[in-house]
Amino acid sequence: MLPVIAHATTAAHGTAWVKVLLPGRPNSHAGWIPARSATPDNTRWQIVVRISRRTVTVLRGGRPLRTFTAVVGKSSTPTPLGRFFVEEVIALYPQDVGAPYALALSARSDVLQEFDGGPGQIAFHGTSNVGGMPGTAASHGCMRLNTPDITWLAHRIGTGTPVTIST
């Protein structure tokens, strides 16, 4: 599911188009697709990350519902800024790094072209088997949350949920 960020109609043919956020590099890039190719779906959920505060705030219907303290990217591998979305929610095995859940985002690291065999994808994930104290800047760009917090998030947030990461 790709979040729609704009609508337009071409005058010549009357074709309706929607502008959608796209995953991958460059971060926060978008493209236009015919509206007839899109299946409308709405979410009342939104996530806002404030790097300077090291917080993850979950909104429902535009109102803050929960705020969590997170580990964010360290200065050499910062968490990228921009407009993104949740690509997938993954239940991890207890022995996996970042267990028990990961919410993979459309964002990619601005520094690491690959990480641990993957494309340098940014995610919310747990602190299991990777550590880090929420409220610090110590990750490779991901946002790490304590187990109860990432579990709460994973049980409520679905694919396509918009995520805004700012300073």
Model-inferred region functions:
Residues 24-27, 62-66, 160:
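Short, surface-exposed beta-strand-loop junctions and turns on beta-sheet-rich folds
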Residues 19-21, 57-59, 87, 125:
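Beta-strand residues in well-ordered beta-sheet regions across diverse protein folds
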Residues 35-74:
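A structural motif detector for short, solvent-exposed N-terminal "entry" segments of globular domains
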Residues 29-31, 66-68, 82-84, 120-122:
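Short beta-strand segments
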Residues 24, 37-45, 74-83, 90, ...:
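Exported/periplasmic cell-wall-interacting domains
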Residues 13-16, 49-54, 98:
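A short, compositionally biased
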Residues 1-36:
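SH3/SH3-like beta-barrel superfamily modules
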Residues 2-10, 46, 54-60, 85:
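Beta-strand cores of secreted/periplasmic/IMS beta-sandwich domains, seen most often
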